[in-house]
Amino acid sequence: MADYNTLYQQGLYLSPDQQDLLLAALSSNNPTQKQQTVTHNSEANQNLNHTPGHASSGSFSVSPPSGLDGSVNQSTTFGYEDSPYLDLNPDFDLDFLGNESLIGDLPPSLPSTEDYEPGDKRKDIDGQVNDKEDSGKKRRESDEKAAKKPGRKPLTSEPTSKRKAQNRAAQRAFRERKEKHLKDLEAKVEELQKASDNANQENGLLRAQVERLQLELKEYRKRLSWVTSTSGLSPVNAIPGAYSKGMYGLNNNEFMFDFPKFGDLPGSHLFTNTQTSKSNQNKAKDNPTATPRSEAQVPGVLNRNDLKISSPNGLSNGPSPAKSTPSGQTPNSQTSTRPGSGTLNGAVDNNGAARGYQVNSSYSASTKQATHDTPSSDSPSSSSDSHQSQLLSSNGTSPEPSLHSPAVKATESSTPHACTYTTINGEESFCAQLSMACGNINNPIPAVRQNSESASNTPSHANSSDKALGLDFFAQQNGGQFDPVLFGDWREPQDAILSQDFGTFFDDAFPLPDLGSPSHNFSEATKQPAAPKKDLIAEIDSKLDEDEEVVPGEDKSQMLTCNKIWDRLQSMEKFRNGEIDVDNLCSELRTKARCSEGGVVVNQKDVEDIMGRVK
C-alpha cells in the first residue's frame, strides 16, 4: 500500500488544462463529484498526453513498457518480471480507483487535495515554477476554509471592516461625551435658574418693603401736617424768628428788624414802653379819621377794652397802655392813642389780637398787652412811613407779625387782611392774600390759621362783650369760618394702614369674632359695605411717576393758580364796578386752597362755585 502511494505521487502530474478543470470541480458543492472528476480527468489526460519519460499509473494496465521510466526503457536487462511494479496487484489498483464512487464521500482521514502538494511543487521540464498553479492553490485553500455557502463572504480581517469598527467606536464615544456635556449643561442651567429665582424673590421682597416704607413716610408727613394745622399753638409759633421775611413783607422791606430771642421776650416790655407811647402819639396824628369809628361795635369785634376786661390785675375798661409808661401820659394821650391801638372792625381786632398775642400767649394779660404795644419802630418817622407805605402796597395780603412791623396799623381798620386791588399791584396783592392759606419752609403753618388760632387762645374771647360768637370754641379756632380742610378733605380715599380714617382701620385690623354677640351683630348691622380694596402697588407706582404733586389724589389739570383766578376775577363786570367784596371772596377761596410746590392752587370746581355765588 505504501509503495502504491509513493508510486501514485511520483506518477501524478497535471497540465494547466487539467488544473483548470480541477479548480472547477473543487468549486462545486459535491466533494465526491470533485474527486471523481479529478480522477477520471487525470486518467484521460495521462493517456492522451502520455509522453516518454513520464510514468503514469494507468499505463500499467495497458502495457508495462508504456508506464516505465526512461531509465527503465534504456536498460534492456530488465524484463517484465524485473519491473519494480511486479509487487503491484492490478486488480487492487482498479478496485481502489473505483472505491470512491462505490463507498461515497471519503472520510477526513483519507488524503485530501493538500496531500498532492509535493507533486505540485515539482518543476516543469523546462525547470520553471508554475506561478499559476500556486495562485490557484491559495484560492483553493481560502475557498475550502470559508465557503460553506455559495458566494464570497467579506473577511473581518480586511482594513475596510477595521475602519468601520473604529468609526463606530469613535461615534459611540462622541455620543457619550455629548450626552455627558448636555447633562452638565442642564445641571448648570437648573442651578442658575434657582439662583435667579431666589434673587428675584429677594428683590421683590425688598421692593415691597421699600414701597411700604415710602407709603408710611407719606402717611407720617400727612399726619404731621394734619396735627400742626389743627393744634392750638405749635412750638413754631413761639419762635419769632420762624417767620419768613421774604413772604411777610412784600413792599415793606424797610420795617424788617432783628428782635431778641425767645428767652428775652418776657421782660422786653420793661425797656420799650417809652417807645410805645411815642409811636402811639404819632399814630394818633397820622390817623385822625379813625376816631369816630373807634366807638363802633361790630359783630365779631375784639376791642382793646375786651382785652382789658380779662386782665388778671383787675383793670377796668378805662386804663390804657399809657398808664404803664414811666413818662406819665395824660388822659388826652390815652384817648388819642386808642384809635390807633384799639381798632374798630371785629375781624381786624381779631387779627390784631392774633398778632399781638400769638408769641406770648402763655403769659398774663398785662404781659400780653405790653408785648402787643412793645415792638414798635425806633423812631416816630418810621411809624408814619409805615402808614403811608401800607396805603400804597399790599399791607394785609402778607400778614406780618407784630414783631416785624409797628404794633397796630391804621390801615387794619378795614379787613383782617386788607388789599388794595385798584392799584398796579392788585394781582400781586390778591395772590399774596390767597397764599396765606399755605406756609413756607421756615414756618409750615399757614398764616391764616396761625392768626385765627392765636386769637382763639386769648383770654378775652370768653368774656367778650360781643355775643355774636358765643362760646363756640371751634368757630374761634378757625376765625369764625368753617374749614372742611381740617376734617379730612385733603386725604386720599384709600385703605392705608396709617390713614386718618380710624374707623375703617380698626374694623379691618380687629374684626370681632362671629360668636353671635349683640355687639357683633350691631356692628355688622351698622357696617356699610366695604369698598373694594385698591392695588397699593399700582398707586405707589403712579405716585412715583408723577413729577410734581399738587395734593394727594388731586388732578393737577383741574387746579387753578392764583394768576388764573385773578384773570377770571378781572373778567367779571361786578369786579370792575367794585360791587364784589374781594376780601370775602378771598377768604372763601382760602378755605378751598391747596398747597403745591408752585404755590397756592384752588380746584376749578370750587372756583366756579364761589364765583357763581358772587355773580
Swiss-Prot record:
Residue stretches of biased makeup (Polar residues)? 27-50, 270-294, 322-344, 358-369
| Disulfide bond residue pairs | C562-C586, C562-C595, C586-C595
Where can the motif Nuclear export signal be found?
Answer: 580-587
The gene name reads yap1
Q: Where in the cell is it found?
A: Nucleus; Cytoplasm
Q: Which GO terms describe its biological process?
A: cellular response to oxidative stress; positive regulation of cellular response to amino acid starvation; positive regulation of transcription by RNA polymerase II
Name of the protein in question: AP-1-like transcription factor yap1
UniProt note: domains: Contains two cysteine rich domains (CRD), referred to as the N- and C-terminal CRD's, n-CRD and c-CRD, respectively. A nuclear export signal is embedded in the c-CRD, with which the nuclear export proteins interact only in the absence of disulfide bonds (or otherwise oxidized cysteines) within the c-CRD or between the c-CRD and the n-CRD.
